[in-house]
Amino acid sequence: MTATLLTAEQLSSVAEKLPGWTLADQRLQRQWRFRNFVEAFGFMTRVALLAEAMNHHPEWSNVYATVTIELTTHDVNGLSDRDLKLAEAINLLEPG
């Protein structure tokens, strides 16, 4: 699937469409804090399976019970529709 770079108008509405995500330097970023490492790693596993199915992979880190995810599309050198779709799907995986 070819990625489409987001327009300035689309970028301005990201905060409304994606609760919890922030926009910085052509990247979407979000951080989650879990009760422990096992919960954090379980969340990362679910995200990994989702990302693989969508063929769009995050940049991320895990420090004990904290997971940070950044999304960008290298092919278009910025944010694309693929980043929005993955962020929306990740939000549906959230615990609680």
From Swiss-Prot:
<protein>
    <recommendedName>
        <fullName>Putative pterin-4-alpha-carbinolamine dehydratase</fullName>
        <ecNumber>4.2.1.96</ecNumber>
    </recommendedName>
</protein>
<dbReference type="GO" id="GO:0008124">
    <property type="term" value="F:4-alpha-hydroxytetrahydrobiopterin dehydratase activity"/>
</dbReference>
<keyword id="KW-0456">Lyase</keyword>
<dbReference type="InterPro" id="IPR036428">
    <property type="entry name" value="PCD_sf"/>
</dbReference>
<dbReference type="InterPro" id="IPR001533">
    <property type="entry name" value="Pterin_deHydtase"/>
</dbReference>
<dbReference type="GO" id="GO:0006729">
    <property type="term" value="P:tetrahydrobiopterin biosynthetic process"/>
</dbReference>
<dbReference type="Pfam" id="PF01329">
    <property type="entry name" value="Pterin_4a"/>
</dbReference>
<comment type="similarity">
    <text>Belongs to the pterin-4-alpha-carbinolamine dehydratase family.</text>
</comment>
